[in-house]
Swiss-Prot record:
GO terms for biological process: cell wall organization; peptidoglycan biosynthetic process; regulation of cell shape; response to antibiotic. PANTHER family: UNDECAPRENYL-DIPHOSPHATASE. One of its GO terms (cellular component) is plasma membrane. The chain crosses the membrane at residues 3-23, 44-64, 82-102, 109-129, 188-208, 218-238, 249-269. It comes from the Bacteria. It is found in: Cell inner membrane. It catalyses: di-trans,octa-cis-undecaprenyl diphosphate + H2O = di-trans,octa-cis-undecaprenyl phosphate + phosphate + H(+). NCBIfam families: PRK00281.1-2, PRK00281.1-4, undec_PP_bacA. Bacitracin is thought to be involved in the inhibition of peptidoglycan synthesis by sequestering undecaprenyl diphosphate, thereby reducing the pool of lipid carrier available. It is a multi-pass membrane protein. This is Undecaprenyl-diphosphatase. The keyword Methyltransferase does not apply. Pfam families: BacA. The gene is uppP.
Amino acid sequence: MDIALLIKAAIMGVVEGLTEFLPISSTGHLILAGALLGFDDDKAKVFDIAIQTGAIFAVILVYWQKIRDTLVALPTEKQAQQFALNVLVAFVPAVVLGLLFGKAIQAHLFTPVVVASTFVIGGFIILWAEKRQERNPAVARIHEVEAMTVMDALKVGLVQCLAMIPGTSRSGATIIGGMLLGLSRKAATDFSFYLAIPTLIGAGVYSLYKERALLSVADVPLFMVGLVFSFVSAWLCIRWLLRYISSHSFIPFAWYRIAFGVVVLATAWSGVVTWTP
């Protein structure tokens, strides 16, 4: 297989791994990177599933102890049952709205103005959420995911649906949404990552079914390179972020989003990127 193509696959894997779990929208960055690398044909649609799989493996590895303990305790312990129920309840809204409106959103909302607007608006919402907790730390009433109720989980799940709008960021919506709903920065981030597991698996399986005609055994090496680089970069990114939020806010990501929104418009107006799915 062409070495240049494998290098592009590695770069795309790193982009996915570094952006999937940060509040900056992996979709927007993958579109831009794919356009700049010339890696945005039909094959890229299936490739996205491979690199997303790498990110899923990474978050499972980071949280494996909690996941394993929950599965073992699920038949007998109420806390484990409550946690599993919360993740399931938060997952359902995205499934329902995705099946109902996913095609319409892809057809009508993947435009430069929408993508740029959501980047910028999301940036200002992050600034607001962080300033709100800074002024009044008491608004963070939930400091551990185990303390969440089903209603808390449902609200986070509803907020996650906003990530269907391109440029929003799934992790950004759930983390910042969780903070605005009363979760601490750490609790919101942890729950966002737990929720990512069924959400990304569900989206991947659905996409794999839709794009099954594009699958080819010849592309396996390409997909494996992307998966491995995505896995490693996502694992490093998650571990770094969990350390970072223990003493820092998400404000730098807010300014990054605002700046990136300007980049989206500039690349679209210049014709460098078409910003279509």
